[in-house]
Amino acid sequence: MVFSNKSLLYIIAIFFASFTTLSFANLTDTLPVKSELNAVETKVLSEEEINKEKIDEFKAHHVRDAHEFSLLEDEKSGTHYGFPLPIIIWDDAVHIFSSSKFEHGHAVAESNGSFYRLGHNEKIYKVDGANGELTGDEHHPTNKQVLDFSITKSVLMLMVTAFLMFFIFSGLAKSYAKNGSIATGIGRFFEPIVLYVRDEIAIPNIGEKHYKRYMSFLLTIFFFVWFLNIFGLTPLGINVTGNIAITAALGIITFLITTFTANKNYWGHIFWMPGVPTPMKIILAPIELLGIFIKPFALMIRLYANMIAGHIVVMSLLALIFIFKSFGMGVFSFLLTFVISIIEILVAALQAYIFTMLAALYFGSAVEEHHHEEAHA
């Protein structure tokens, strides 16, 4: 099927208008989830304070992880539309049960005679008895926090993305083998991207001699981050790359690959830089050593900050409608959110490119072969 440029623009416009409209529906249906520590407050909230709580909860719903996959919530009936996820915790023994036992954070879950409550920021705490409450001050519970290995919303999307990538690229590999290195179907879309990563990222930064050993990781990390960023643009409250734990894991993996594949020249330039006076070597060595750990940290923060900032900007623009409650502001907010959403598509691909490019730079510096005699002659 062939689309004209005009038809394609219409499809894209409808696609993002639908996303924005669904986001409006999520905002109007989202209820503030009060923590147990605030349950003792009896003061009556004003309409402005209630709206602020709803807006804050709407933002939190889209940027934080959760133990259930919630799509919509009916404010009048209190009905949640979504599905629970498995809870896996360690508290002197392994406990496995459904997140539905928490009843969206309003109930105590029982497992093998122990009782647990879902607290602030989706952390699970042990409580005393079926009616146990969280205790503490300033929203910091003093209850015992258990080790949480649950399949949360972010973990589920990691699995979905991994399966999607396996399905796409295993099919691409089969089409290559079957048709004599000629991609077919959806592989025609991904083949130029694979070649771009190889020819414009891997080879220029790592070199033709060593790039092949890193291609698997570079391709995986590029498409992995890109797909996760695209999922984050949907109104489903998925924000995997805006989770500092996820980006930290990606940064640590890059750090380990760089460290364990580096050659002696790499370590020589760190601990005893050639061509530099000895007093300067003593000063530069700890700085270079610190740089080893700063690089993956920069990778982690760059991706995390850019993605979560984009989500918060979009959510804040949507919230303007319910703050000003005017038709003009509604139209303005909708159009501005539409434009920002389109920019976010570019940012999703750009952040995947930057992460892959920086990883390739680190790998290239780790395997670079230096010729000191020529360089410092």
Over which residues does each language-model region extend?
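Membrane-embedded alpha-helical core segments of multi-pass
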Residues: V160, L164, I168, V194-R198, ...
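Cytosolic juxtamembrane amphipathic/interface segments immediately preceding
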Residues: P141-V146, V197-H210
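Perimembrane topogenic segments of multi-pass inner/organellar membrane proteins
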Residues: V2-S7, T21-A183
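Hydrophobic transmembrane alpha-helix segments characteristic of membrane transport
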Residues: F167-N205, N265
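Alpha-helical transmembrane segments
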Residues: L8-I11, V155, M159, Y214-L218, ...
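Hydrophobic alpha-helical transmembrane segments and adjacent short intramembrane/lumenal linkers
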Residues: Y214-M215, T220-T234, A245-A249, I253-M357, ...
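Membrane-interface helix caps and helix-loop-helix hairpins in membrane proteins
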Residues: T234-V240
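Bacterial N-terminal signal peptides
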Residues: Y10-T20
